[in-house]
């Protein structure tokens, strides 16, 4: 785990221009992160891994605010994920809600433990392809297919799939790393 003050110091020492943080299901750490990182003259990038329902699967998608309007949309999505589920299901939004408010958001496909990874591991590749096409179509140029390398046995095959499908979907690849603070 990385402490935010240590991360801020690292950013300053290494003249890092921007760094992002993505909370899980909420934005509770975004204020502290933004304040600390800004002290190092580094641009904070705020995101959240919000759960969405696609067909019958519920899983997270990393969402990043492009600007202040995007930050408001993140707050809205996070709040609705908790407020609009009246039964005992885990907090989530329907994927169509994301499509309606994606203009000021960057959407990542997620790793092996996210919504897309769940579809991949269940061998529901046609549905995963439809999800990627829908995310790309409804977000303009703001959808990125994610690859990660954490040593998970399924990541290598998932990476190969994502590299291949990115050309078909016409979505760029982004390499990310899950770090916890």
Regions flagged by a language model, labelled:
Residues 1-181:
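Phosphodiester-processing cores and adjacent nucleic acid-binding clamps
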